[in-house]
Amino acid sequence: MAYNKRKKGYHNKKRTCHFCDNKLTYVDYKNVEDLKKFVNAVGSIKPKVATGNCAKHQRKVTLAVKRARLMALLPFAVARIRVHRSLVSAPASQNTKKVAEKVEKEKAPAA
């Protein structure tokens, strides 16, 4: 007879809402340090599952982040460093040669 084997004792811990725990009713858009906790590295708002907020406070956080972006307190998108594929795929010796050539070109006019 087929049955499902379940692992006992491995229940996911449910995250509690930060605002409900601290009994905060207002999410301030000017408090950038707290809002950065709800924004990921790219600059997009983290989902409710990741933050643990309840639906009510997640909507308030979303509104506060959008207001902070409009007031230029938070960036819309964070600048990412992009690496050219040709430099990444080339062997290390070629990369060092290219970098050395660039450094020499920069030093030559200054001397």
UniProtKB/Swiss-Prot annotation:
Residues 98-111 have a biased composition (Basic and acidic residues). One of its GO terms (cellular component) is cytosolic small ribosomal subunit. Residues 90-111 are annotated as: Disordered. GO terms for biological process: translation. Keywords: Ribonucleoprotein, Ribosomal protein, RNA-binding, rRNA-binding. GO terms for molecular function: small ribosomal subunit rRNA binding; structural constituent of ribosome. Disulfide bonds: none annotated. InterPro entries: Ribosomal_bS18, Ribosomal_bS18_sf. The keyword Ribonucleoprotein applies. Binds as a heterodimer with protein bS6 to the central domain of the 16S rRNA, where it helps stabilize the platform of the 30S subunit. Part of the 30S ribosomal subunit. Forms a tight heterodimer with protein bS6. Belongs to the bacterial ribosomal protein bS18 family. This is Small ribosomal subunit protein bS18. It comes from Mycoplasmopsis synoviae (strain 53) (Mycoplasma synoviae). The gene is rpsR.
